[in-house]
């Protein structure tokens, strides 16, 4: 049985997000995935939470992480499914199956990009979606999730 993590949120990053900092910096900026994870841990801690940060380029592994979040009774999920946002009904279904409050994040404004990026399956399984704020969107997502959970910043 998985060890409970009731004070933890899952921060899930999908394909190619391991390339942040070097991948198309004119679109994604120069911050790395390590920078994103540090930002998430810091923001989560300000609400008395831990951030379990995961990244995978494989759809099935992302689904396994979502199922693990359910088994461990995590409080919430922040997800940037990358390109899978626009194609993966399986990720959508996994998020709905676990019924964990979820916020979708995209570093860029997906609605100002190619038309195939305008639709997001993962957004339909989330209570909120943020895009276009750069990596700051992760901080905003955690703050929004904390508000949804009724958590206040710790002094």
From Swiss-Prot:
Q: Catalytic site residues?
A: 28, 106
Keywords, sorted A to Z:
Amino-acid biosynthesis, Aromatic amino acid biosynthesis, Lyase
GO biological process terms on file: amino acid biosynthetic process; aromatic amino acid family biosynthetic process; chorismate biosynthetic process; quinate catabolic process
EC number(s) stated in the UniProt entry for this protein: 4.2.1.10
Catalytic function, reaction form: 3-dehydroquinate = 3-dehydroshikimate + H2O
Mind listing the GO molecular function terms for this protein? 3-dehydroquinate dehydratase activity
The record, for Gene3D superfamilies, names:
Dehydroquinase, class II
PROSITE patterns on file: DEHYDROQUINASE_II
Q: What residues correspond to the site Transition state stabilizer?
A: 23
| Chain residues that bind substrate | 80, 86, 93, 107-108, 117
Give the first-level EC class, as a single word.
lyase
Pathway(s) this gene product operates in, as recorded in its UniProt entry: Metabolic intermediate biosynthesis; chorismate biosynthesis; chorismate from D-erythrose 4-phosphate and phosphoenolpyruvate: step 3/7
The protein's job, in short, is: Catalyzes a trans-dehydration via an enolate intermediate.
| Similarity section | Belongs to the type-II 3-dehydroquinase family.
* Subunit text: Homododecamer.
Q: Which NCBIfam families match?
A: aroQ, PRK05395.1-2, PRK05395.1-3, PRK05395.1-4
Protein name, as recorded: 3-dehydroquinate dehydratase 1
Native organism is Bradyrhizobium diazoefficiens (strain JCM 10833 / BCRC 13528 / IAM 13628 / NBRC 14792 / USDA 110)
From the UniProt record, report the name of the gene that encodes this protein: aroQ1
């Amino acid at each position: 049985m998985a060890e409970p993590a009731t004070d933890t949120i899952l921060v899930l990053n999908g394909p190619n997000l391991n390339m942040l900092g070097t991948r198309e910096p004119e679109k994604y900026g120069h911050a790395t995935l390590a920078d994103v994870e540090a930002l998430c841990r810091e923001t989560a801690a300000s609400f008395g939470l831990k951030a379990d940060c995961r990244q995978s380029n494989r759809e099935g592994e992302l689904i396994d992480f979502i199922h693990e979040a359910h088994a461990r009774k995590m409080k919430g999920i922040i997800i940037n499914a990358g390109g899978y946002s626009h194609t993966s009904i399986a990720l959508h279904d996994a998020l709905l199956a676990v019924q964990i409050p979820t916020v979708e994040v995209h570093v860029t404004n997906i609605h100002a990009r190619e038309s195939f990026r305008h639709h997001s399956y993962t957004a339909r399984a989330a209570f909120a979606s943020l895009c276009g704020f750069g990596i700051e969107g992760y901080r905003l997502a955690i703050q929004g999730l904390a508000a949804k959970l009724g958590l206040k910043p710790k002094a």
